[in-house]
C-alpha cells in the first residue's frame, strides 16, 4: 500500500465495497463496513464523497479500511505515514495499534523508525535491501547506534553516514581508545 491506493473516481463507500468483494455474506460485509466507519469516523462523515477529493490522510485511512473489509489475518502496510502531517501520523499509528489489538497481525514497512519501533514487537533495520540489524523493537529503540544513525550522525564534511559507517566508526573508535 505504498502511497495512497484508492479508486479516485469511486466514493468512499464504493471503495470500501471493493475491499470486501470476495465476501459473499452481506451481513459480514455490513459488519466490516460498520467496523471501518467506527475506526475511521472521518470516513463516516465523507462516505458519499469521491475518494479523489479526500485529503492525503483520509485517502490513507480509506486504503487501510478497504484492506480491512476483507477481514484479513495479516495486514501488510507499506509506508502508511508517507507524506502525512504529524497529527495524522499519530492517528494512523493509533489505528495500527487498534487493528493489532483486535487480532489482526500487522507487517509494517516504514521509514519513520521511531513510529514503527514504538508500536512493533520486533523490528528489522534494512539498508540498501539488506537487513543490518534486528531484534525486539524496544531494544532497537534504545540501541545507541540506531539512535545515532536516525538522529543523523554527520561526518567531517557534513555528509550523512550510513548505518554501516556508524557501526564501523564506533567499533574503530572503541578499539583505538
Kindly label every feature range from the protein language model.
Residues 9-29, 39-44, 48, 152-154:
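ABC-type ATPase nucleotide-binding domains, specifically the catalytic core motifs of the NBD
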Residues 153-177:
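ABC ATPase nucleotide-binding domains
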Residues 89-102:
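Helical segment within the ABC ATPase nucleotide-binding domain
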Residues 50-54, 58:
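Conserved ABC ATPase signature
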Residues 10, 53-54, 67-68:
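ABC ATPase signature
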Residues 122, 134:
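Short, glycine/charged-rich "phosphate-handling" switch motifs in NTP-dependent
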Residues 69-73, 79:
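A short, proline-enriched helix->beta-strand linker immediately N-terminal to the Walker B motif
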Amino acid at each position: 500500500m505504498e502511497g495512497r491506493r484508492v479508486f479516485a473516481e469511486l466514493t468512499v463507500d464504493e471503495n470500501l465495497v471493493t475491499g470486501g468483494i470476495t465476501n459473499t455474506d452481506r451481513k459480514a460485509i455490513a459488519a466490516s463496513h460498520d467496523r471501518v466507519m467506527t475506526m475511521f469516523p472521518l470516513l463516516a462523515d465523507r462516505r458519499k464523497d469521491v475518494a479523489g477529493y479526500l485529503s492525503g490522510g483520509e485517502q490513507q485511512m480509506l486504503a487501510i479500511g478497504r484492506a480491512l473489509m476483507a477481514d484479513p489475518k495479516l495486514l501488510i502496510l507499506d509506508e502508511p505515514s508517507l507524506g502525512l502531517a504529524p497529527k495524522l501520523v499519530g492517528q494512523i499509528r493509533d489505528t495500527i495499534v487498534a487493528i493489532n489489538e483486535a487480532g489482526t497481525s500487522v507487517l509494517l514497512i516504514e521509514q519513520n523508525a521511531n513510529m514503527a519501533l514504538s508500536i512493533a514487537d520486533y523490528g528489522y533495520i534494512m539498508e540498501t535491501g539488506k537487513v543490518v540489524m534486528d531484534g525486539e523493537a524496544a531494544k532497537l529503540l534504545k540501541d545507541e547506534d540506531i539512535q545515532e544513525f536516525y538522529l543523523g550522525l554527520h561526518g567531517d564534511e557534513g555528509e550523512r553516514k550510513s548505518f554501516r559507517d556508524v557501526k564501523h566508526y564506533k567499533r574503530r573508535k572503541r578499539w583505538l581508545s
